[in-house]
Amino acid sequence: MDVQQIKTILDAHGSWLRNEVGGVRADLRDADLRGADLRDADLRGANLQGANLQCANLQGADLRGADLQGANLRGADLRGADLQGANLRGADLQGADLRDADLDFSAWPLWCGSQDAIVDARIASQLAAHFCVLVCDDPAYQAARKALLPFACTSHRAEDLGLVEI
């Protein structure tokens, strides 16, 4: 997809977000966006299912509520991106840089596709907090939870999740 096509789609999407006549939600399903410069793009609610965003620059992009199911985000720069409520199921985040990204209420892929993702302490503590609220009576889990709990309690979501250090 060339730069002009992307610009046209983003302009129509912006109109859609503002409820303007002629606005159309961005449909970038299966689009080849490898290496695309989408810094600070407003892609709220966009359909990016199966899109190839390998090595794309999405730094500071607004992807709230975007559907990135099955997207290839290998090596993508997502630093400072807002991914609140984004669907990342089946997305490949290997080598993606998510430092300073906001992943609140998003679907983080719990499979090998999220291995090697680069995160900051905020995201790591949030993942740890979600791990620590699981209910499991296995002694190995209990030991891991006990070791992880102090770090998990530093999460900005710890209080919402009812986490307290024991």
Regions found by a protein language model. Give the residues of each.
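Catalytic phosphate/metal-binding cores of nucleic-acid and nucleotide-processing enzymes, i.e., regions
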Residues: 64, 74, 79, 89
